[in-house]
Amino acid sequence: MTTSYLTFLAVAVGPPLVALGVVRAARWDGDRARAAGVGILLALALSYTTPWDNYLIATGVWWYGEGTVVGRLWQMPIEEYLFVITQTLLTGLWVQALPLRPTAGFSPTRRDAVLGALAGVLVGCGGAVLLTVDATFYIGAIIAWAAPVLALQWAVGWRYLWRRRRVFAAAVLVPTLFLSAADRYAIADGIWILAGQYTTGITVLGLPIEEGAFFFVTNVFVSQGLILYAWVLARWR
């Protein structure tokens, strides 16, 4: 019997989310502005992901197993909205548990901003090319969708992110590996099914590369956002 989407979230995402919440509460330093960073990113994640997710579901890039969801809001199951929320919280709390140590004195140049934005544009161009072929449509949709956010974040502080690359790597890789493993189970169990028409068929340890790319990109969004947010706060103070 296929696991329900809600049960999957409760079992796979719930325990680490609660554990990170307990750690965050134990380390609470009263800095409301810093804590607000996760809330800001949560609102942005929902508003940016919802139309994209709905479009891909409507296109038939993936669908859900029979009886695995409790209801839908537009094309997306209610649980999908919960997944966006819980992933953002999970990664956000993880990032804030790391030693960010923002460097207030670091200042980017206009040239840095231009280079960062151009890099994001190049990513978008690559995604647009992949969108033209059915087999790479899903991976192209992920890359093209990621490009505007990456362009903005890199324009703001790609050089600062490079200086904090070790923390950034830990911030991204740990939740990406965890969520990819959980996603691998969900696909194997039939909670959601990817369309062969829109995917490459390439897998790593049974996980479609498109799904790994999605979790990598979204965790990059959250990690870069919070690292840059902490840096901007330090500069303002």
UniProtKB/Swiss-Prot annotation:
It catalyses: a carotenoid psi-end group = a carotenoid beta-end derivative; all-trans-lycopene = gamma-carotene; gamma-carotene = all-trans-beta-carotene. This is Lycopene beta-cyclase. Its main location: membrane. It is a multi-pass membrane protein. The lineage of its organism: Archaea, Methanobacteriati, Methanobacteriota, Stenosarchaea group, Halobacteria. It holds the Pfam family Lycopene_cyc. Its EC number is 5.5.1.19. It comes from the Archaea. Pathway: Carotenoid biosynthesis; beta-carotene biosynthesis. Catalyzes the cyclization of both ends of lycopene to form beta-carotene, a retinal precursor. Is required for bacteriorhodopsin biogenesis, a light-driven proton pump with a covalently bound retinal cofactor. GO terms for molecular function: intramolecular lyase activity; lycopene beta cyclase activity. InterPro entries: Lycopene_cyclase_dom. The keyword Transport does not apply. The chain crosses the membrane at residues 3-23, 38-58, 80-100, 113-133, 137-157, 170-192, 213-233. It comes from Halobacterium salinarum (strain ATCC 29341 / DSM 671 / R1). Belongs to the lycopene beta-cyclase family. It is found in: Cell membrane.
